[in-house]
């Protein structure tokens, strides 16, 4: 009886460990860009990043079955619970998209009203406003993308293409195993994602010490400045 109880505790501990590891590996957020995709589980996700997040958290291997909303989406939303970014904002809000990329690719609705891109049109329809922030600003650039800088993926993520990964602008330098200093841990993670063959990991906080020739150069420069 005692052995059975001990075995049960061990199984619970293993399950908890696996669950905690899964949560750590899935600690990334996604941009609130509304570009719906249909999952292999028959549920609709706000975009492919949210599908990957759901797949990661559920460990069910959910894949994209197609672009756009599924023919019939279950009553319960497929979008994961909101993920808090480093800036304190949340993403994954069920329903209307909260932001769109400032990419100028004009489209018109059935009434002939023009929008900066498909996402802004979908947002306006969803919220029932007919309002296009990007179009009113007259800026077809990527200022919103630069301004938001929402955390998109955790460091070391080596999943699908890294093109939709963004990091906050905070300066908290870290040292990489490749001998480079990165502005913050998230930036190191993006490089690791883009170059999985290098298996770049964080080896410490702060900037890398200046050594060798670099030290000599820095010293010589300091001496010149002092003499000047």
UniProtKB/Swiss-Prot annotation:
GO terms for molecular function: peptidase inhibitor activity; serine-type endopeptidase inhibitor activity. Residues 23-72, 90-127, 156-208 form the Kazal-like domain. The keyword Glycoprotein applies. Glycans are attached at residues 25, 199. InterPro entries: Kazal_dom, Kazal_dom_sf, Prot_Inhib_GrowthFact_Antg. Residues 71-92 have a biased composition (Low complexity). Its main location: secreted. Residues 1-22 form the signal peptide. Disulfide bonds join 26-56, 30-49, 38-70, 96-126, 100-119, 162-193, 167-186. GO terms for cellular component: extracellular region. It holds the Pfam family Kazal_2. Residues 69-92 are annotated as: Disordered. Induction: Expressed in zoospores. Expressed during host infection. Interacts with host subtilisin-like protease P69B. Secreted effector that interacts with and inhibits the pathogenesis-related P69B subtilisin-like serine protease of host tomato. Inhibition of host proteases by a pathogen extracellular protease inhibitor forms a specific type of defense-counterdefense mechanism between plants and microbial pathogens. This is Extracellular protease inhibitor 10. It comes from Phytophthora infestans (strain T30-4).
């Amino acid at each position: 009886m005692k052995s059975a109880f001990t075995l049960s505790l061990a199984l619970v501990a293993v399950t908890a460990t696996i669950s905690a590891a899964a949560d750590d590996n899935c600690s990334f957020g996604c941009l609130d860009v509304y570009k719906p995709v249909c999952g292999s589980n028959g549920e609709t996700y706000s975009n492919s990043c949210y599908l990957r997040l759901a797949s990661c958290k559920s460990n069910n291997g959910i894949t994209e079955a197609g672009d756009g909303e599924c023919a019939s989406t279950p009553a319960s939303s497929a979008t994961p619970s909101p993920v808090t970014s480093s800036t304190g904002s949340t993403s994954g809000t069920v329903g209307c998209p909260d932001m769109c990329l400032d990419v100028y690719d004009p489209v018109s609705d059935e009434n002939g009203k023009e929008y900066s891109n498909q996402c802004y049109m979908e947002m306006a329809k969803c919220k029932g406003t007919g309002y296009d922030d990007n179009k009113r600003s007259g800026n077809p650039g990527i200022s919103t993308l630069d301004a938001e800088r929402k955390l998109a993926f955790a460091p070391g993520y080596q999943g699908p293409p890294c093109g939709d990964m963004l990091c906050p602008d905070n300066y908290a330098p870290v040292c990489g195993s490749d001998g480079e200093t990165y502005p913050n841990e998230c930036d190191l993670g993006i490089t690791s994602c883009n170059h999985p063959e290098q298996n770049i990991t964080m080896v410490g906080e702060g900037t890398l010490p200046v050594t060798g020739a670099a030290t000599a150069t820095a010293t010589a420069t300091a001496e010149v400045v002092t003499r000047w």
